[in-house]
Each structure stands twice: as C-alpha cells, then as structure tokens.
C-alpha cells in the first residue's frame, strides 16, 4: 500500500498538525517505509509460536506508594500565564 499525500494530510489533521508541502512529501516516504516493514512482518510464519504480551517474563512489578516532597502549587503556577483557582488554564483542544 502506497502512502499518499492525502493520507499524510489526514493523519496530520487528526493530530492537529500543520505541515509544509516538503514535510508532507518527507512523511509520506517515511510512513511508506515503516508500513513496508510491517508488511514484511506479516510474511513471517508464526505457526506453533506462543503468543506473548511481554518480551521479558515479568509480571506486576509493584512498589510501595510513598509520598515525597514536591514543589507545591504556588511554585508550580509561578510561571503560568493564566492560572485559575490554583489550576493551569490551557487552550481548548476538543471542539
């Protein structure tokens, strides 16, 4: 499957990215190469291979939750351009 400029524009729109024409060309080639590697993996014969979810045989490496000193709200918000009621105000990203 060949990645087109339209495919790159679609992905960029989903990611809310603005790309130049040069970047679109570059990313189309890079995405095409990456998907080519995925197609190679599809050719592998995996009959008789046990499915795995982890590369290392390790399960649930838990640690104790411990509180540690932090910077505090006032210091965290010190450089915030528009804090509101002790929180960061950020631009709306979902329409």
Swiss-Prot record:
Quaternary structure, per UniProt, is: Heterotrimer of A, B and C subunits.
**SUPFAM superfamilies associated with the record:** Glu-tRNAGln amidotransferase C subunit
Give the protein's biological function: Allows the formation of correctly charged Asn-tRNA(Asn) or Gln-tRNA(Gln) through the transamidation of misacylated Asp-tRNA(Asn) or Glu-tRNA(Gln) in organisms which lack either or both of asparaginyl-tRNA or glutaminyl-tRNA synthetases. The reaction takes place in the presence of glutamine and ATP through an activated phospho-Asp-tRNA(Asn) or phospho-Glu-tRNA(Gln).
**Reactions the enzyme catalyzes:** L-glutamyl-tRNA(Gln) + L-glutamine + ATP + H2O = L-glutaminyl-tRNA(Gln) + L-glutamate + ADP + phosphate + H(+); L-aspartyl-tRNA(Asn) + L-glutamine + ATP + H2O = L-asparaginyl-tRNA(Asn) + L-glutamate + ADP + phosphate + 2 H(+)
**Enzyme Commission number(s) from the entry:** 6.3.5.-
Q: Name one GO biological process term.
A: glutaminyl-tRNAGln biosynthesis via transamidation
| Family, similarity comment | Belongs to the GatC family.
Report the domain of life of the source organism: Bacteria
Q: Which GO terms describe its molecular function?
A: asparaginyl-tRNA synthase (glutamine-hydrolyzing) activity; ATP binding; glutaminyl-tRNA synthase (glutamine-hydrolyzing) activity
Spell out the protein name for this chain: Aspartyl/glutamyl-tRNA(Asn/Gln) amidotransferase subunit C
Q: Which organism is it from?
A: Pelobacter propionicus (strain DSM 2379 / NBRC 103807 / OttBd1)
Stored HAMAP family:
GatC
Keywords in alphabetical order, please: ATP-binding, Ligase, Nucleotide-binding, Protein biosynthesis
- NCBIfam families tied to this protein: gatC (TIGR00135)
């Amino acid at each position: 499957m060949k990645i087109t400029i339209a495919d790159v524009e679609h992905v960029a729109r989903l990611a809310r990215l603005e790309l130049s024409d040069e970047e679109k060309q570059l990313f189309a080639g890079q995405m095409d190469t990456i998907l080519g590697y995925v197609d190679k993996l599809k050719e592998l014969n995996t009959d008789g291979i046990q499915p795995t979810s982890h590369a290392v045989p390790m399960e649930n490496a838990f640690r104790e939750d411990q509180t540690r000193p932090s910077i505090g709200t006032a210091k965290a918000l010190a450089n915030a351009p528009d804090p509101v009621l002790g929180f960061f105000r950020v631009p709306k990203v979902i329409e």
